[in-house]
Amino acid sequence: MIPGDKSETDIVPGLLSVLDDSPAKIAPAPNAPQSTGRRTTLARWLTSPENPLTPRVMVNRIWQYHFGKGLVATSSDFGRLGESPSHPELLDWLATRFAGKSERGHSELVPWSFKSLHRLIVTSATYRQSATNPNAERQQLKDPSNRLLWRANIRR
């Protein structure tokens, strides 16, 4: 699109078609009739319990903060073009708990609580493991980049 070129068609707002092909339902905010309602619709979609992407991205960023690399290494490209998760079941499990859901209907975490998620991660065996490992030579041959988290990465 070239600035000032009005020959192009109007762009219709929508949500991520990879997740939902249906058109976005955008209604003006009731308390702001002069608003188009686009930002409100986006905010509601991002925080919707049916949106699986938001808790997965948030969990991945917090994991990246603690371990130096996210469960999805390309945390800025969290989709088909990025890398797949190194531990998809762990990412789903953490995201489900973070959003306040679990198999039993309740979660061990306070829903959407960053503090609870940080506590869960830093008290895990994975976080507390040593940077040295008695089986380091054998593990190094199997997983030289430590993608499987067999030891703690040294960070400054």
PLM features: what roles do these ranges have?
Residues 1-156:
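Primarily short, surface-exposed interaction patches in extracytoplasmic proteins
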